[in-house]
Amino acid sequence: MNSFAFLLVCIQACLVQSVFSQCTSRAAVAADRGIIGGYGLGAPYGLGCGYGLEAPYGWAGYADYGYGLDAYGGIGEGNVAVAGELPVAGTTAVAGQVPIMGAVKFGGDVCAAGSVSIAGKCDCGCGEVYGYGLGAPYLY
């Protein structure tokens, strides 16, 4: 009788654990109000986005180039390769100076509906001369 009672208690413990783990699993707590969701680190009001550190109003927000915590430095060198299908719908606007040294090449079919226009001027200078980079206003 004692072993039967012990077995019954073990079965009940497994059932209770199974029932409560469905409602309060690690994923449910983290996704709703834990570290990665809700008001946690990756939330709209946490460190990841919204009003947090990486937010538009946070440290990496709307700052001039070279002033924000995560602002683009303006200096870069290397190859960029994109493979696969790139369906693009809508409007893409790039404002400001975009210095490009090298060549831009499309291989294969590029289907576009609508109009594509590039306006502005292209300078071959890059870096602090044009006000980009870390501490740009102090490097003149």
From Swiss-Prot:
UniProt keyword list: Repeat, Signal
Pfam family, one: Chorion_1
Signal peptide: 1-21
Record's GO cellular component terms: egg chorion
The keyword Repeat is annotated on this UniProt entry: yes
Classification via InterPro entries: Chorion (IPR002635)
Repeat keyword on record: yes
Domain of life from the UniProt record: Eukaryota
A GO term for molecular function: structural constituent of egg chorion
GO BP of this protein: chorion-containing eggshell formation
Function, as annotated: This protein is one of many from the eggshell of the gypsy moth.
Family per similarity comment: Belongs to the chorion protein family.
Protein name: Chorion class A protein Ld2/Ld41
